[in-house]
Amino acid sequence: MALSNTLSLSSSKSLVQSHLLHNPTPQPRFSLFPTTQHGRRHPISAVHAAEPSKTAVKQGKWSLDSWKTKKALQLPEYPDEKELESVLKTLEMNPPLVFAGEARSLEEKLGEAALGKAFLLQGGDCAESFKEFNANNIRDTFRILLQMSVVLMFGGQVPVIKVGRMAGQFAKPRSDPFEEINGVKLPSYKGDNINGDTFDEKSRIPDPHRLIRAYMQSAATLNLLRAFATGGYAAMQRVTEWNLDFVENSEQGDRYQELAHRVDEALGFMAAAGLTVDHPIMSTTDFWTSHECLLLPYEQALTREDSTSGLFYDCSAHMVWVGERTRQLDGAHVEFLRGVANPLGIKVSQKMDPKELIKLIDILNPANKPGRITVIVRMGAENMRVKLSHLVRAVRGAGQIVTWVCDPMHGNTIKAPCGLKTRAFDSIQAEVRAFFDVHEQEGSHPWCIHLEMTGQNVTECIGGSRTVTYDDLGSRYHTHCDPRLNASQSLELSFIVAERLRRRRMSSQRL
């Protein structure tokens, strides 16, 4: 049965919720340094791009459920609408997962990244799962993001904004609504908050109660992340020791040793100056969460009106993005997102028309507020060199302020000889290099990267200094959706990017 329920949110529905929403004191945020205010490969088609709008889009009055008047793609059909309604009402009564003040703080920092004064590091699982939910996995992903951020911060000499694809990245769009194996055709797996990945009829039926479980898992993940961020686990000295260990045990350690030891020397100087491990600046960090805004009933149920500003915030995450398949100008997802005040991402591939991008940005950010829009580009190295410059010029010509981000994962999915999906580290590195090259040619700021990655020692992407081959893929291939960089590959990529940032910085200083 298709989604058609109507919802209304009220800040007075729960005494606990009311207290949380109207508390003017923001909860402690999750910068290590104080951030400024200022075999043959068989290509796989990664996406079916959104079709350009055929007519001019008229923007009517926005409301929490005005998206229901638009065409909604990629949403599941639940068999029992009343059961879904009951679950959504429960979610409405639950406390928000994040707070408006935190989202505003992230927007300010993303505005700095748009001007080249900060670097955005966004990473995490392709799709979070119920089965792999445990403290160690959360800790390991958080840890590798910390390690990467220190390397990038030293290379660029700018604050690093750390945003996880965590605590809500469950739902996944699919190019085909059905999957067929051995003549049996069932609905595709769309993420653990919708249905199960086991290939049987019962598992593939969308279950609204999975939304409650996803909410609870997100809340627990956020709780642990806050503890890690503020409880001493993020201490700079500790993170640097981890990086030195990586360098010493890497086959290409000599390549990164100089940078790692320079970071260690800088910390020694700071300690001598009084910034020891006990100082809050050295032991805590900021951290935010993000996910794709796909399952609109869930996102609506967690949207709250901020009493201090009168604006609506999607309190399921600090930042949400619209995907390549759901970014139609006259579609339901764009309609929902134009009314929430969170920082927003827009995923674009080589199929994005520059004029369409300008229109989309104008719909989502009519006030042209810095930090509001992040354009996440994913198109492969060759397309990046040909197509990106047209997008950059169009956006600049329209006077729009955006934060440009490189997603080198989705445009590089291939099929290995064994049949598993994988991504080659060399291709990922090539797309990052192309992203930097184009922005340097255009005089814009390439200070951001978006990765599907994990802190685990998986074998899902081939290559890297600790080489993963096609033959290795089956040994630790644990992803529920797309292949992820493992911890070693992720950190290696951060050293490569840091080297590029340092060269760019040194070159600009000589001018």
UniProtKB/Swiss-Prot annotation:
Pfam families: DAHP_synth_2 (PF01474). Gene3D superfamilies: Aldolase class I (3.20.20.70). Its EC number is 2.5.1.54. Pathway: Metabolic intermediate biosynthesis; chorismate biosynthesis; chorismate from D-erythrose 4-phosphate and phosphoenolpyruvate: step 1/7. GO terms for molecular function: 3-deoxy-7-phosphoheptulonate synthase activity. May be involved in the synthesis of secondary metabolites derived from intermediates of the pre-chorismate pathway up to shikimate. This is Phospho-2-dehydro-3-deoxyheptonate aldolase 1, chloroplastic. It comes from Solanum lycopersicum (Tomato).
